[in-house]
Curated annotation (Swiss-Prot):
Entry function: Sulfur carrier protein which probably makes part of a sulfur-relay system.
Single GO MF annotation: sulfur carrier activity
Keyword field contains Cytoplasm: yes
Xref: NCBIfam families: PRK00299.1
Entry keyword annotation includes NAD: no
SUPFAM superfamilies referenced in this protein's UniProt entry, alphabetically: SirA-like
Protein name (record): Sulfur carrier protein TusA
Length: 81
C-alpha cells in the first residue's frame, strides 16, 4: 500500500505551534494553492485533531488522509471537493 502523505504537492510544518496558529497557517497556505492541489500538514497540537477536519468541512476542502495516533500528526488535504 502506498503512503498517501508522500504524494503531497505542498507541505506545512506546524510543529510547536498552538491553537489557533496551525489552522491560520493552513488557511493562508491553501489560499495560495490551485484547486485540486494537496497540502501535507505536520503538527503536534492535539487541537488539530479536531480543528483540521472542521476547517476542511467548513471551507469545502477534502481531508484525504490523517494520522493522529501519535505525534507528529499528519493531515493530507486537497483544495476543493
Amino acid at each position: 500500500m502506498s503512503d498517501p502523505f508522500a504524494q503531497a504537492q505542498h507541505q506545512l510544518d506546524a510543529l510547536g505551534l498552538r491553537c489557533p496558529e496551525p489552522v491560520m497557517m493552513v488557511r493562508k497556505s491553501v489560499r495560495k494553492m490551485n484547486e485540486g492541489e494537496t497540502l501535507l500538514i505536520i503538527a503536534d497540537d492535539p487541537a488539530t485533531t479536531r480543528d483540521i477536519p472542521s476547517f476542511c468541512e467548513f471551507m469545502d476542502h477534502t481531508l484525504i488522509a490523517s494520522q493522529t495516533e501519535s505525534t507528529p500528526y499528519q493531515y493530507l488535504i486537497k483544495k476543493g471537493l
